[in-house]
Amino acid sequence: EERRAKRSPLRDVAGMLRSFDYAALDALRDVATTADEWAALAPLAREWAQQSRGAFLQGYADRAKGTPLAGALEPGRGLLGLFELEKALYELRYELKNRPDWVRIPLQGILGVVG
């Protein structure tokens, strides 16, 4: 029954946007072994995530031209922002339960939407 329920494709877009943040910070965790390395590389990881999010949204917007989704692809705003927040809150709950040392990733996502 749940599979047949209509879902907004913006939920999937929000999930993809969140995955870029995870990929960037997971890669950073793999290479930054000291606080100095973290401080030096964190801005690059954030920039990569932002560039990737932007490229994904641009490609999606190009394909969505002429559809109701075309005007709803501004990250952190409207329905897409709500779905991003929903996904980040779900991630926070998951990480607190299973991987507390990863909590930084969803917290940054939450702050990015509400801040």
Predicted regions span which residues?
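Active-site activation/catalytic loop segments of kinase-like enzymes and analogous catalytic loops
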Residues: 1-64, 85-100
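Short secondary-structure subsegments characteristic of cysteine-rich extracellular domains
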Residues: 45-48, 78, 103-115
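All-alpha amphipathic helical-bundle segments outside canonical DNA-binding/catalytic cores
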Residues: 69-83
